[in-house]
Regions:
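A cross-taxonomic marker for long C-terminal extensions/tails that follow the last structured domain
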Residues: 190-193, 197-274, 279, 289-341
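Structured, charged N-terminal subsegments at the starts of enzyme catalytic cores
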Residues: 50-135, 139-143, 150
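Core alpha/beta catalytic barrel or barrel-like domain that forms the active/cofactor pocket
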Residues: 81-90, 118-140, 162-188, 208-227, ...
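Generic recognition of flexible, low-complexity loop/linker segments
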Residues: 73, 171-174, 244, 251, ...
Length: 492
């Protein structure tokens, strides 16, 4: 397998600005083929997530990339210089989409054939374009083992089976390559994240793997538990993963799924160095759509280059796990109390947030509409955009529960939280409580922890949304949401 990629381009729809290669309001279909080429050739990403989770994906992406951009992929081999990594649904939690995963797995040998034909035509050695599949919302190792075993036995394994008169499937239609694929668990829920070490150990042992890439979410934990809790859960999970790896004798290669909004990770081109310093244990970072399309191209290239050049994969610093999880419990409870109050308004506002990718909506505990307590919420990007639209950065929610001792602990354990808080607080508008039934004193308590100058242009945009929402002017609400998103350089 090639070296572990450092920068994974994803298709998360958090961008305020549309890229040059899309004609409409939504990135879809053939746009995403061009996007995969663009992020590799022009931006310098060394991996692209090809996403089938909650959206339509193209099973012929490899063939299209090689046929349209043959000169480029002659030099930058698909599968080596640029890795295409598929994300599919998790059958254990998405029953209505379960067979899509099987279709994805069946397409991998066909993609290999397309790449092998391309290599033969250009006098090159064959390289498998797809090495791994990401399975989302993982809660146990069985969900990973089933995928790997299905591919080995029922996809690649069918080649040796007799189809008629002693003739094997391989003799009939050709070999099935690669012989096996690895599975990357995407772990998003608190209890599963805190058991990530157990999940990875069981998977690595069952499949006799010496190394495992493990994908830790940053966005959905923030939606479910609040911003400070999301980072502390990740830091504890990473500490446990590395401890397990040392005990068992395997290598773990963590991926962090961070977005540009402070609430969703605060990974922007300007903050590339700060993010790698906050998470030196991580080897691969996601760059989502806002990172790529809401900043000048040269700034984006420089940010990606810094992510690639950073010294990453260091063992984590020791962390007092009990103390960290005590803060998680308290702030998550305070966060949930505030979300309980604002959920109906957030759901109304989310209807005005522009779509940036063609997606399908599913509802479930950890499905595409998320739940906090008893409340169904929009997906993380729509949720974040809705709150920013009225000047309520969600990083503030739950943070009023921090004690002085908690603040001291965070200063020593995860000082980046204060950067996230400072970057978010610029966009606070005290008038947000006109539409959100929140106690202003509690909402503003975290602001005392940072010095910040408010962004006047953004406040004007949020004033526009608040006033338009109050009078029922839907078009003005949409206009204000777009204006504010462009100002802060992310949608949600």
């Amino acid at each position: 397998m090639p070296d572990v990629p450092r920068v994974m381009s994803t298709q998360h729809p958090d961008n305020a600005t549309l890229p040059f290669f899309t004609a409409g309001e939504v990135i879809e279909g053939e746009d995403e083929i061009q996007e995969a080429y663009y992020v590799s050739s022009h931006l310098g990403c060394d991996e692209g997530m090809w996403d089938f989770e909650g959206k339509e994906g193209d099973n012929y992406a490899v063939k299209k990339l090689l046929s349209r951009y043959d000169d480029y992929f002659t030099d930058c081999r698909l599968g080596e210089g640029f890795r295409l990594t598929i994300r599919g649904p998790n059958p254990a939690l998405e029953a209505s989409e379960a067979k899509i995963l099987l279709e994805i797995l069946e397409s991998i040998p066909r993609s290999y054939d397309a790449a092998a034909l391309f290599a033969d035509e250009h006098g090159l050695e064959s390289v498998s374009p797809i090495h791994e599949v990401i399975v989302p919302m993982v809660t146990d190792a069985d969900q990973l083992n089933a995928v790997e075993e299905y591919y080995r036995s029922f996809v690649a394994g069918k080649g040796s089976r007799s189809v008629w008169n002693g003739r094997t499937v391989e003799e009939w239609v050709g070999p099935f390559e690669p012989a096996e694929i690895a599975v990357i668990p995407l772990i998003e829920e608190r209890e599963a994240m805190l058991r990530a070490d157990e999940i990875v150990r069981e998977y690595a042992t069952a499949q006799d793997r010496e190394s495992v890439r493990v994908f830790l979410a940053r966005s959905d934990p923030a939606l479910n538990y609040g911003s400070v809790a999301a980072d502390l859960i990740n830091k504890v999970a990473l500490a446990r993963l590395y401890r397990m790896a040392d005990d068992v004798g395997i290598d773990v290669h963590p991926i962090l799924g961070a977005g540009s909004a402070p609430f969703r990770g605060n990974l922007t081109p300007e903050r590339a160095d700060a993010t790698t310093a906050a998470y030196p244990e991580v080897e691969t970072f996601t760059v989502q759509s806002a990172f790529k399309y809401d900043n000048p191209v040269e700034t984006v290239r420089e940010g990606i280059d810094r992510l690639k050049r950073a010294e990453l994969g260091a063992p984590p610093e020791p962390i007092d796990e009990d103390r960290a999880l005590e803060i998680v419990d308290r702030t998550a409870a305070a966060y949930a109390d505030q979300v309980d109050v604002i959920a109906p308004t957030v759901n109304r506002l989310s209807a005005y947030v522009p779509d940036r990718r063609a997606r399908k909506l599913h509802v479930g505990l950890f499905g595409y509409s998320r739940e906090v307590g008893e409340n169904a919420l929009p997906r993380a990007i729509g949720y974040t955009a809705s709150l920013y639209a009225v000047g309520c950065p969600p990083t503030l929610l739950g943070a009023h529960a921090l004690t002085d001792d908690d603040v001291t602990f965070l200063e020593g354990t995860f000082p980046a939280f204060f950067d996230h808080l400072r970057d978010a607080a610029r966009y606070y508008n005290p008038r947000c409580t006109d539409v959100l039934d929140l106690e202003r004193a509690r909402l503003e308590t975290p602001l005392e922890l940072v010095d910040v100058e408010p962004d006047d242009g953004h406040r004007e945009a949020t004033d526009e949304v608040i006033d338009a929402f109050d009078r029922g002017d839907e078009e003005a609400v949409r206009s204000g949401i777009r204006r504010g998103a462009r100002r802060r350089r992310f949608l949600g």
